[in-house]
Every structure is written in C-alpha cells, then in structure tokens.
C-alpha cells in the first residue's frame, strides 16, 4: 500500500468505526437501586433443642412444626413454643433421608429431602403418612403462597410446583442489582413476599416471587451471641411466620435458642 493509499484509508477506517459505535450503542438501562438493608429487635427468646439440626420450621395452631436433618437422625417434630418441648416426633420413614424444608397446605405437612428427590407428606394433626411427591434436583427450602409450592435448591432459582400434583410449573432467578443471589436456603411466605435465608450468612432476602428481584435484606448479625460455643455448621437456618399474630421466629442448626424478632429500619451510620 502506498503512502497516499494509507492517508485515504485512515479516514475510511475511522468512519467505519464510528458507524459501528453508532449501531451498537443504544439507550442505557437504568441500574437497579441497591435493596435496603434492615435490622431487627429481639422481642422474645425461647428454648430450642441444641441437638436439632433444624432445616425447616413453620408455625401453625399454636405450635412449631420442625424438620430436622442429618441422614439417620432426620425427624418431623411438633414443638411447644414457650418451652421448646417436643410433644410429637416422627422418625419412621426418614431413616435413609436427609430431611430439609417444610411447608403446610390444607391440613398436610410437606417435608423435603436433600438428595432423595422426594417430598414426604403427612397429616398435620396425627403425623400419619399421606404419600410422597417426586421432584428433580436437590431440595433445600419449601413454602406455599396459597396458590403453589415454592422450592429452593441451593442455587439462585425459586421453583414453583402445582399444589395438587407437585408438578413443576415454572421458576424465577433471584437477583440483587442484576446479579444472581445463590445459596437460597429455607423459605417462608410473608405478606406477599418470599423470605429466604442465604446459607452460611446472617442475612434474609425479601424477594418478589413474580420478578425474583430482592426487595430488601434483613441483617441478623449478632443474634446468636452471648458466649455460646457453636459448631461451624450451627448457622442461621430457618424462618417461621405466625400470620394471625404477625410474629416472626428465627433459629439455626443446633442453636439452643429460638428468637421472636421484629424487623426495623437500620440505623444510619
């Protein structure tokens, strides 16, 4: 190429590049605002079985119903809130399972298993077995929004299942500021939102089930303090909501305490 050709070629290259920029550049999408972080106030403290590897918890009819894990030790329990006393316990049928999340629907309890790919169904009043439902992948957390079951599997997904057949009918990815939120664990449906404990953290994500967007965070740091020596796996793990009483309960694996808390705006620093 001659010097003259190079001189004429350079403006052509610049024009071509400017055209490419003009074509590829478009209107910028507005960035999502950071989800607000809230704090908490302890309202009441109740005793909790420190040997319970708690994986699921719900509040119904004045009692706590608890799913505990560890293969060979898994159980389903009915517990007195005020004393922590286990008044009913079932282990039969769970010998080979690692029990996980727990939900109630129309007088029946649905207990997930971690890797067995089956949900066990019981009568709420008697704990008598009422069947099973199969699902793919792992089971971590479970709740119900009066229309469908909502399941977490440790990823950034919430999966939706039909209430009658337990057939998967959809899913949504959970994001905060456009980034996936992984390790979604135990779930609770609270006033139109899915609240999810994020595994091995002290935070609860408040999630829109329609969009998957994190609406807010609850920071429970320092909740289990007071000199207790806990196992490395003794992490915050479950949420239970008393809808009629508007009370919120949280505890963890192997925790000796269960807390009733009130969510409050975080103090500005």
Region locations from a protein language model:
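Beta-strand-rich domains and repeat architectures in extracellular enzymes and scaffolds
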Residues: 43-75, 91-103, 252-254
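Short loop/turn segments that connect beta-strands within beta-propeller blades
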Residues: 80-84, 123-127, 163-166, 208-212, ...
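Blade-loop segments of beta-propeller domains
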Residues: 84-121, 128-139
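Surface loop/turn motifs at the tips and blade-to-blade linkers of beta-strand repeat domains
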Residues: 45-50, 90-95, 131-136, 173-179, ...
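Short coil/turn segments that connect the beta-strands within blades of beta-propeller domains
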Residues: 61-62, 106-107, 146-147, 191-192, ...
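A short helix->beta-strand "capping" segment at the edge of beta-propeller domains
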Residues: 33-51, 81-88
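Signature of short aromatic-glycine-proline-rich micro-motifs recurring in repeat-based ectodomains
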Residues: 54, 184, 231-241
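Conserved beta-strand positions in repeat-built beta-propeller and related beta-rich domains
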Residues: 66-71, 109-116, 151-155, 196-200, ...
